[in-house]
Amino acid sequence: MDKNFKAINEPIIDFEPGSEHRKLLLEEIERQSSRQKDIPIIINGKEIRTGNTKPCTKPQDHGHILGHYHEAGPEEIQMAIDSSLEAWKTWSNTSLEERAKIFKKVADLIAGPYRYKINAAAMLDIGKSVFQAEVDASCELIDFLNFNIEFAYTMQNSFTPISPDGMKNELEFRPLEGFVFAIAPFNFFSIGGNLAISPAIVGNTVLWKPAPSAVYSAYYIMELYKEAGLPDGVINFIPGDGPSIGDQVLGHKELAGVHFT
C-alpha cells in the first residue's frame, strides 16, 4: 500500500425518502429484525460456543431478541491470551504496508457492501437513529481506519534521526511486547471498533471485549475482519462478564496495555 496514502472523511449518505439507499437499509433492518443471530466467541479465527448464553435485545424493546451470544469463561480467556501471544510472533513482524492493506479493505467493505448491515445493526442493537448510525457506525469507523493508516505511515516516515559524521543513529517503532486488552463502550460503535483496530494496525495483537449490551453490533465488525483477510489471532473476540474477564486479564504477566474509553 502507498506510504503516501492520505485519508479523507467519508461522505455521509442522507437516506432521503424514496432513495435506493433508504430502500436497501430498510430491507436490511427487516432482515435482521426477523431472525436471531447466534454469536460465538472468536479465538484464533475459530468459533467457540460455550452454551452459556445471554440475549441481545433492542434497547427500546427488551422483548425483541436479536440473537444470543456465548460468554467466554476462564478457559476461553486463557485460550484467547495464548492465541494473541502466538499471533504476535508473526503480526509484530508484518510490514506496515501489509497491515495497512488489510485494514484499508475493512474500510472499503464498510463503505460498500457492509454499510447497510453495519447501520442496521447499530440502529437495532444500540438504538441509533438512521443519521446517528450513518455518522457513527459507518462514516466514523471508516475514518478511524483510514486516518489510523495515514497516521501510522506519518509516524513511521517522518522521524529521521540526525547522524553526524562517523555515527549512525536509528529510530525504530515497534509493537508492545505482549497483548492489548480493548474494552468497548456500549454506546459508541465506531470507538468500540477503533479500540481494537488502532493497536492492531501498528502491530499489536488484541483481546477485544465488547460491551454486553452491544455484542450484536460488534460481531458484525468481527465478520469484516475475516472477510478482509486479517490473520487468525490478531483480534480475538471475547464477550462475557466484565469483572470476571477483567480480573483474569489484568492480572496476566503478558498484558502490555489496556485500551478503553
Model-predicted segments: where are they?
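Glycine-rich loop-to-alpha-helix module at the N-terminal edge of alpha/beta enzyme cores
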Residues: T50-G51, P55-T57, H62-Q156
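Rossmann-like NAD(P) dinucleotide-binding subdomain of oxidoreductase/dehydrogenase enzymes
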Residues: M123, I142, A152-T261
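Hydrophobic face of amphipathic alpha-helices that form TPR/SEL1-like repeat modules
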Residues: M1-L66
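Conserved beta-strand positions that form and line the central face of beta-propeller blades
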Residues: D14, H68, A121, V234-F237
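Alpha-helical scaffolding segments of alpha/beta enzyme cores, especially the outer helices
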Residues: S19, K105, F147, Y220-E223
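C-terminal segments
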Residues: M1-E27, F131-E134, C139-S158, L171, ...
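A generic structural signal for nonpolar/aromatic side chains embedded in well-ordered alpha-helices
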Residues: F15, I29-Q32, S84, A122, ...
